[in-house]
Each structure stands twice: as C-alpha cells, then as structure tokens.
C-alpha cells in the first residue's frame, strides 16, 4: 500500500544536489546572474501596464499598494531563501513540499506551478505581442489584426477601434486616452450596434478556413519559439541573453524615474490622507491584490538551484536582492506616474507612455515601448526556465516519464525534450487563447505555492530542527511554535487568494483534480520514493 504522504528524505535530496556529470545540469550561475534572473522574471507587464488600473483603484496610494505586495512577497521570499540554501535542487516549491509535506502535496504543488510558469509564459507572450505590434508601427509596419491576436481578441480589438473612431468623430473635444474618452468608448461597447459589428468585421478582414474565421497571434507564437530555442542551447547562453535584456529594461525604468521626475507636480499626490488615498485602505488593498501579478516570478530563481555555482550562498542573495530591487523600482515608478498626471486622468491602457505624451514628450513613448518589450521577453525566459526545471525535478523523482522529461542534451546540458514540449505548448496557447482566460489563473496558482512554502518552513523547523541551514528565515521562535514571518506570509498571501473570486478557485480546483488523475494513474506507480519505501518494508 502506497503512502501518499511519504516524504523524500533530506539526505537523498542533498546527495542528488551534489551529483554532477554529463547527465546532470551544469553549474554556471553566480549571485549576479541569479539576481538578474529574478529581476528579469518580475519586472514586466506589471510596471508597464497594470500600474494604470492600480492607480484608478488606489489613487496616489498606489505607492503603498506596491509596498504591500512587496512585503507579502518578501515574507514568502525569505521562506524560499531558507529552502533554496538548504535544499539546492531544481524544483523550487515542489522539492520543498516533497521534503516536508509528503509526495501527494509535492505533486499538487508541482502540478499547480504549471499554472504559474507555463500559463504565465503564454500570458506574457500575448502581452509581448501587443508591444511588438506598437514597436513595428514606429517604422510604419502594420500586421493584420487576424495575425496579431487570437480570433476573439482580434474581433474585440476591431470593435474597440471602431468605437474609438466613433467617439473621436462625435466628441473631438475629449482628449484621447483620458478617463472621459475611455468612459465614452465603454458606453458604446455596452450595446454594440449592428453598424459597429459590421464595421468591425470589415476592419478585421480575417480569412476563413472551413467557413470559420481565422485568428492567430503570430508574434506571440514566434517569440515563444525563439525563447525556447535559446533555452535549449544552454543555461549559460540564456543567462547572458537575460542579463542583456534586464540591462535594457532597468535602464528604461531608470529613464522613467529620472526624466519623469522633472514633470512631477507634488500637488497631484494630494494634500492629506483622503486625497492621497481617495478610496482608503480598502482601495490600497484592492489595488495590491490586482497588481500582485507584477511580483510573480522571483521564486523561479530557486528552480535553478542545480545550476548555481554556490547555491547555499547565492540563491538567498538572488531571491532577496531581486525582490528588494523590484519593489524599490515599482514604488518609484508609481510615485512618478501619479505625480506626472492626476490619478483620475491616468491612461489605463498604456499609463507610462501616455503620461509622457500628456507632457508633449512623444519620443519618450518609443523608448518605453522598447523597455516593455525587453521586460516581457525576460519574463518569458525565466518562466519557461522555471517550468522546465520543475518538470525535470518531477521526472527525476519518477512522477513523470524520466526518459523524456529528465533527458539532458549531451552537448548543451539542458533538459531539451521537455523544454521543446513546454515551449510549443506555451506558443500554441498564447497564440490562440484570449489573454484574460489564462492570466487570472496565474495569480492563484502562484499564491498557493507561496502559502505552502511558508507552511513547509514551519513544519520542517519542528520535524527536523537540527538540519543545517545556511540561511534561516528570521522571525521564527521556540522551534517553530512562534512563526512570525512564515505566519504573516500565509496570512498575506492567503488573503490575496481569497480576494481573487470564486471562479478562479473553481478553475484551480478543476486543474488540481485533473492532476490527481495523472498522479494515481501513473506517478504513484513509478515514484522513486515509493519504490525505496517498498524495498525497505520488504527487508
């Protein structure tokens, strides 16, 4: 009889982490590369897109919303750092759960991480496509709508374009991109007329296949394939590529902070608490729950544990340094954005770009577009790294077919087969699926992983207090009986999970049920830990 909660011995985990050779991952990443991977994973859509919606929920208090998110992620990050230093093995939260909560919980968290990494990469590839299309417009190049989005999004985009043109013609006095303009467009879209629908179909001009209109996000498909190829070639090359991209991205963010500060009017931040936070603490919390996506990705650093030169020292540095850097940059951009433009007038679709356009600095928008492209590219890179390393760890434990998911390329020393599979799936999903259908699942999957890692730290402090810990999560007293930091991590991230709504919970539960079918039909029969336990019982 299999023990569903059989834990993977820490001694076995540590010995596996020390294995080297042509069939194992190559250790080439130092603290700078790991920090760059963390920054690369985090800074992306959140800072270039979601800040606008966050501002309309919190006003200038958006700065505190980013601080709140940063604090919640720091609690989880400190727990990740303890595990990453103690268990330097690819797999991240999956490996940590295996050592503390048992095999079934480990499988659940590994399956859950697919929502964060693979679906996150698909979501970001779609967002990358939007900025790439804007980038091409700088050079006068336009891609047909049906090749720029999935069919549903392309039709929606065409309808929005028609509505915007109608508002421009009917109300030329309303500034394009202002809240009043967006409200007028939204009013038209509530009940689209037959004339609008016909004009949208004409604008879309999509070809038909077997009588069905085609929609295929070609840029999203191609960028996912390009990132996949880079990852197959090698982690060292991927790290160099990511470092270059992160340099560009951070430079653009610093440009926004330095150049944008010249246009800040302190009065836009308000004169008291009520004008600084027009919707109070509730508004700040609501914005924090929404912009949480802006912090997703730092945990991917721990999935590269077997490729770090000195994981016990470098992984905590990479995790904590990347979180600190990103939080500072986010708060700074929020301050500049809400200082440049009154929060009521901040553009929702492209807030930073339009903030400069409002001050007649149009050339800056081109620079920001380049920064957004760089940001989203590095996010995709790190998310795909994270997914492939989790699958590698699960296959090494026998929970997935090892010959495929743990196959290491003899030349590049990367898990090339599962990288190609994950990249293809991410490319296909990102090219044919509306971004809103997959994006909301990413947050809840990530938050579940954070909660379980915080809980696992508490459990391991009590069950294995003498295990060497090169880095210790602070704020844990009396052998784990008073876990202040992990406890706050559970409460903070659990609250954010609660705020995501019932349908996200339903989708998460359905996804986990599918995973349980896979576990009981295949994984439990091939588990390395279960086989070792059976041998021990036989003796």
Question: Which functions belong to the PLM regions below?
Answer:
Residues 1-51, 55-61, 74-78, 87-90, ...:
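Membrane-interface "cap" regions at the ends of multi-pass membrane proteins
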Residues 129, 215-263, 278, 319-323, ...:
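Membrane-interface loop-to-helix entry segments
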Residues 212-215, 227, 403-416, 450-501, ...:
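C-terminal membrane-solvent junction of multi-pass transporters and transport-like membrane proteins
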Residues 26, 47-160, 322-329, 506-511:
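Extracellular loop-to-transmembrane helix junctions
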Residues 134, 252-256, 391, 442-470, ...:
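Hydrophobic alpha-helical segments of multi-pass membrane transport proteins
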Residues 19-26, 62-63, 142-220, 244-370:
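Helix-loop-helix junctions that connect adjacent transmembrane segments
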Residues 48, 112-130, 290, 295-308, ...:
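Membrane-helix boundary/coupling elements in multi-pass transport proteins
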Residues 57, 440-441, 445-446, 478-539:
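A generic transmembrane alpha-helix motif of multi-pass inner-membrane proteins
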């Amino acid at each position: 009889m299999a023990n569903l909660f059989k834990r993977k011995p820490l001694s076995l985990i540590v010995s596996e982490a020390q294995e080297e050779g042509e069939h194992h991952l190559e250790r080439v990443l130092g603290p700078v590369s790991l920090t760059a991977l963390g920054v690369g994973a985090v800074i992306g859509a959140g800072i270039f897109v979601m800040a606008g919606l966050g501002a309309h929920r919190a006003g200038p208090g958006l700065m505190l919303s980013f601080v709140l998110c940063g604090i919640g992620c720091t609690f989880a990050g400190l727990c990740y750092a303890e595990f990453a230093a103690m268990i330097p093995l690819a797999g991240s939260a999956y490996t940590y759960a295996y050592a503390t909560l048992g095999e079934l919980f480990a499988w659940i968290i590994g399956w859950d991480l697919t929502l964060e990494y693979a679906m996150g990469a698909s979501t970001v590839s779609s967002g990358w496509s939007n900025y790439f299309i804007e980038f091409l417009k700088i050079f006068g190049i336009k891609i047909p709508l049906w090749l720029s989005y999935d069919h549903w999004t392309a039709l929606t985009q065409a309808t929005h374009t028609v509505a915007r043109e109608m508002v421009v013609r009917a109300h030329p006095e309303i500034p394009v991109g202002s809240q009043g303009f967006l409200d007028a467009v939204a009013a038209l879209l509530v009940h689209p007329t037959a004339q609008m629908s016909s004009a949208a179909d004409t604008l879309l001009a999509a070809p038909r296949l077997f009588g069905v209109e085609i929609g295929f996000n070609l840029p999203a498909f191609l960028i996912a394939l390009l990132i996949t190829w880079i990852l197959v070639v090698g982690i060292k090359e991927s790290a160099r590529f990511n470092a270059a991209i992160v340099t560009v991205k951070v430079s653009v963010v610093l440009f926004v902070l330095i150049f944008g500060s010249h246009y800040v009017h302190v009065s836009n931040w308000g004169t008291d608490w009520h004008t600084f936070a027009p919707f109070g603490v509730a508004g700040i919390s609501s914005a924090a729950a929404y912009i949480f996506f802006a912090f997703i990705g730092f945990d991917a650093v721990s999935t590269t544990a077997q490729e770090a030169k000195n994981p016990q020292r470098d992984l905590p540095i990479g995790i904590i340094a990347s979180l600190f850097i990103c939080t500072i940059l986010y708060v700074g951009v929020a301050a500049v954005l809400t200082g440049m433009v009154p929060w009521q007038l901040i553009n929702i679709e492209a807030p930073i770009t339009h903030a400069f356009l409002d001050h007649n600095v149009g050339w800056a928008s081109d620079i920001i577009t380049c920064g957004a492209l760089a940001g989203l590219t590095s996010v995709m890179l790190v998310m795909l790294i994270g997914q492939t390393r989790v699958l590698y760890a699960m296959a090494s434990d026998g929970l997935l077919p090892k010959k495929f998911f743990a196959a290491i390329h003899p030349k590049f020393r990367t898990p090339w087969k599962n990288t190609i599979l994950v990249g293809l799936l991410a490319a296909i999903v990102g090219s044919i699926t509306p971004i809103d259908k997959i994006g909301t699942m990413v947050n809840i999957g990530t938050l579940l992983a954070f909660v379980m890692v915080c809980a696992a730290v508490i459990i391991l402090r009590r069950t294995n207090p003498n295990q060497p810990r090169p880095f210790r999560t602070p704020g844990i007293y009396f052998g784990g009986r008073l876990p202040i930091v992990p406890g706050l991590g559970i409460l903070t991230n659990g609250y954010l999970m609660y705020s995501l709504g019932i349908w996200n919970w339903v989708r998460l539960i359905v996804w986990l049920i599918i995973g349980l079918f896979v576990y009981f039909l295949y994984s439990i029969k091939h588990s390395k830990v279960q086989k070792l336990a059976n041998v021990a019982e036989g003796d």
